[in-house]
Amino acid sequence: MSIREKFIIPKRYNSIAIALMVIGLLAIIGLYVTHGAKKEVHEQARFWAALLHNSVYFLLVVNAAMFFISATTLAWGGWQMSFRRVTEAISACVPVIGTICGVILLLICFSPDHVLYHWTDSKVVAADEILKWKSGFLNKTFFAGWTIFTILAWSLLGWKMRKMSRSLDDKPLESKEAGKRYIWNNTVWAAIYIVVFALTVMSSIPWLWLISIDAHWYSTMYSWYTFASSFVAGMALIALFIIYLKNSGYLEYTNEEHLHDVGKFMFAFSIFWTYLWFSQYMLIWYSNQPEETTYFKPRAQGPYSGIFWLMFIINFIAPILILMRRGSKRNYATMTFMALLIIFGHWLDFYQMVFPGPMTDHATGETHVPMILYDFAVAMGFVGL
């Protein structure tokens, strides 16, 4: 039997993708003219925060696809093989979005105005004991080096695993011994990727790229929280592609059982995200330490409170009410709706991770700017990629 796997993107979708990228590029230009080119630091921060928010979010989401491949490979999860090309195709976006994200991060890090990362200003560090103590980790050299290493590692390891997988198309396994060697090599590279993933996404990268915007604040749950947010959005993206391809007549060996399992991941990690969301908030609220509560004050009680509580409804209430039922996880329309909702909900999550820090006047406690259409337009550009 043969599987109809070769998918040629219809011209109309190429046109839509190009249109979305043009919209994103025009939005970046417009945002630069209206905010980035101004002298006020908070106006410049508005521009760079929009780029950081979208580039980091979409990079971590597409990178979650390769984590899913590696984790299921190590767990001997053969059920995902029928749609593995889908997850591989999503992970193939990592080099492109990673390059864009890396350039944005390095420009922010070495910006002479220190618009997002105040720890890059040597004068600020010299006058701040907390930043002095963290300077061994929060410094430009380590930030740049680890960022470049991380994006290269994700890209190269993903390329290696995709290359091994595609080799089966050109040269099928001829013997049982060849099959054993392939499984062994695939398992080894998956294990290497998981180790790199643990050292980056599950620890250092959220600290460097996101939490260092509020450099005084700290949370031992933050990296896991960031991982949960990006991974559940990544599973939602996988679900969207599976549903689209099934409706187009592809993935003949992928059935509602597979979609059900993907839906279980979406449901389970929505609960896991909520556990981390609540635990982080509850422990900081209970301890009432000024260094910790300053992070949540503008988010839970200030101008960002609407987004803060809305994402709780989208990312927890909706999944637990809709995806708990077995039938919902097997219904294409319901899964499509929930996948889109989850991707948007965690886009909001990353928005409130990035914006309140640089956009809050710490002297008055007021925010400088609300969410605007430019934010959605920039996101559309990354969707087009």
Predicted regions span which residues?
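Short, Lys/Arg-rich, polar N-terminal cytosolic tail immediately upstream
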Residues: 1-9
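Long, contiguous internal "core" modules enriched in hydrophobic/ aromatic residues
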Residues: 11-40, 134-311
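TerminUS-proximal long segments
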Residues: 11-13, 120-129, 314-385
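Membrane-interface helix-loop junction between the first two transmembrane segments
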Residues: 31-50, 71-80, 169-170
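Hydrophobic cores of alpha-helical transmembrane segments in multi-pass inner/ER membrane proteins
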Residues: 60-69, 99-104, 147-159, 228-243, ...
